[in-house]
Amino acid sequence: MSASKILSQKIKVALVQLSGSSPDKMANLQRAATFIERAMKEQPDTKLVVLPECFNSPYSTDQFRKYSEVINPKEPSTSVQFLSNLANKFKIILVGGTIPELDPKTDKIYNTSIIFNEDGKLIDKHRKVHLFDVDIPNGISFHESETLSPGEKSTTIDTKYGKFGVGICYDMRFPELAMLSARKGAFAMIYPSAFNTVTGPLHWHLLARSRAVDNQVYVMLCSPARNLQSSYHAYGHSIVVDPRGKIVAEAGEGEEIIYAELDPEVIESFRQAVPLTKQRRFDVYSDVNAH
């Protein structure tokens, strides 16, 4: 596939690493708005903005239902309407982090990313497919499945610049979602995420670079800032990795906005030099090809 079909032009992106996740939903939303406005002042040509996982509510299994919202474009909930207005105001594609979603038909709760186009239209959503259920000795014990249900599909978004895939945090540990989006022509994988301070130092950079190199796409991980006063301590270090595995932008632990330019020439030149897309042998590993 040629680069022109993957990414139509250079685009600037911004990842907003903010300390949301407070008990005050509107304060969290307003803080996101403040940071997005700042990003657009600092880099007016920004076309794509990403927010962190669970930015508008506490990241706690006993709080997800309380903060959950029904995602219905015809009757926008508080967060959906707020983020829609921001995308429209600044004419950006907005990957709105994640929010707890209530499905009124099943009463199930999902960890869901909502994606808006430049007109503020909700163009898709991604429900976290792989739930964060871990017990790390001398580390962390956390079970999203106590409250949340897993999503049932992969998500690839089509925009005027090209396609990108969306996963959420723990989803990045499973290479299949990125592979599916890449095979559909995605130029990037975007993961609103909240790794903790145990697994973050071990795997954050490794996984970001692995997903990028595996699929020769850009990878963006957007984390909350670390807040030691909250019950969950995020790793931070929001990051942008290019298709060669090179880190092109990285945040620290605190509140910060990082910027990067995605370049179709980087994708094209690396795919020509190392033509993985032409060399894969799905005739050999045919079970991977089933989708």
Swiss-Prot record:
Cite the PROSITE patterns for this sequence: CN_HYDROLASE, UPF0012
**What does the UniProt keyword field contain?**
Hydrolase, Phosphoprotein
Q: Which SUPFAM superfamilies match?
A: Carbon-nitrogen hydrolase (SSF56317)
Q: Is Phosphoprotein there in the keyword field?
A: yes
> Where in this chain does the record put each CN hydrolase domain?
11-264
Give the Enzyme Commission number: 3.5.1.3
Show the catalytic activity: a monoamide of a dicarboxylate + H2O = a dicarboxylate + NH4(+)
Q: One matching Pfam family, short form?
A: CN_hydrolase
Which branch of life, at top level?
A: Eukaryota
Q: Which PANTHER family match?
A: NITRILASE-RELATED (PTHR23088), OMEGA-AMIDASE NIT2 (PTHR23088:SF30)
Remaining remarks? Present with 4510 molecules/cell in log phase SD medium.
Family designation = Belongs to the carbon-nitrogen hydrolase superfamily. NIT1/NIT2 family.
The protein, known as: Omega-amidase NIT3
